[in-house]
Each structure stands twice: as C-alpha cells, then as structure tokens.
C-alpha cells in the first residue's frame, strides 16, 4: 500500500493478509488492526505517523508489525495493545521528540487489559518519555493477574525517560539482551520498573548512562513494589538495578546472548530495514 486510506482499509479488513507499506504514510485517528495481519515496511524508510495502531479484543490476534518507522502521536499512544494475545512487534524504529511536557505524547508501546503472549524484539525506541507500559492501573489487578506475559529482547532504548518497561501485575515479564543508552534525561529517569507484585527477569542487558536501571523493592510513584530477579547485566555509568524476591520460571527455551556482545549486536541489528 502507498496511501494511508489503503493501509487503513487493508489493516481493518477481515481475513489473513500481509500488508507491505511503501513510504511514510501520514494519517490520523486510530487504525483498528484486525486479526491475522502481518504489516511490514518496505526498505528502511517506510512506516506510519500521526495515527494510533490499535490491536484490541482479539484472542488470538496473530498480528505482526515489522520493519516500520512509527512516530509518536501527540496526546495519544502510538501502538496500543489491549485485551489481545499473540502479537510480535519486531525490527521497528519508534521515535518521537523530547518535549518538556511529559504528557505531550502518551505511550509509545502500551500493553494493557490482560494482553498476553507478546514479543517485542529488535526495535529501536528513541526520544520518548512514556515508553512502554505493561498494565495501566494499580487498581486493575483482578483482570491483569495471570496475564501480561511479555518478552522484550534485543531492543535499543535510547534517550527514553522511563517505562522501558514499567510493569504492573504481569509475570513473568522477560527483559533480556536489550541495550539502554542515555536514559538520564532528568532526576526521575529510569529504565525498568516492576510494580504491584509483577514478576520480572532482567538478564544480559547493557545499561549505559542510565540514571536508575531498575526499580522493584522500593515501588515507584504511588505503585507498590514488584518482584525482580537480575542476572548477568552490565551497568556502565549507571544507577543500580534494584532486585526483590523471586519470579516464576520462563515458560519457553531460549539462549541469552553473552552480555559482552549485546551492545554491538543491538546497535547493528535493531530497527526498521534490518531484517
């Protein structure tokens, strides 16, 4: 597709299809992506701006968003996953502009309302305040407990203020082999937060010039503490990764990359156009 109107039509249509996006398409409002869609950018410079990509109320969704440039949307979220399962967000470049007002943009990639089985891999997320929220409210535990199982791996979080991710209730959220750089935009900047008894495994990540790598036992803002296990991380000119308690085992097999090669792997391989 090469127009926003065609993109919206194809993304919202019923049935399985692969949608190839040519060029940067500018739109507005929300595109409600329907089930069984693979959305891929062509080359390194294709994508979407000005609109929210909504993936909601589908079990399973079976949605892939890959190799897209996605811009922050003033006053709105960029990608909103809500009450949906089986979604892969891979090799995208998600970026905004650093603004003085933290509410100028909403979330870049928010996962809420008991969404489940989500993988976020090999993305560049840059220049954003409210990066990625998992679980939207301290009061939503009855819906969220036992869900919000999300994996983040081989992403580059660059100049993000916070929420990379911020997790309530989800277990186990697996955050491994990501590179965090210059997460030090103000005195409250942090990378990861485990809250409201969430359970996170944080392993093999590189934190470079990060004000606070992780919050857990202390809670954050008005949210109660969560649990966090950290292992084999590298902290370079960064604040600590606070740990607390134990978490449930990861329910899949995987091989974590040695932390010594994570920065070079991620900076070379993450982002749109690098499939």
Language-model features: locations:
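Extracellular beta-rich repeat passengers
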Residues: 167-275
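Acidic, glycine-rich low-complexity segments
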Residues: 21
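Structural detector of coil-to-beta-strand junctions
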Residues: 54, 76-78, 108-110, 131-133, ...
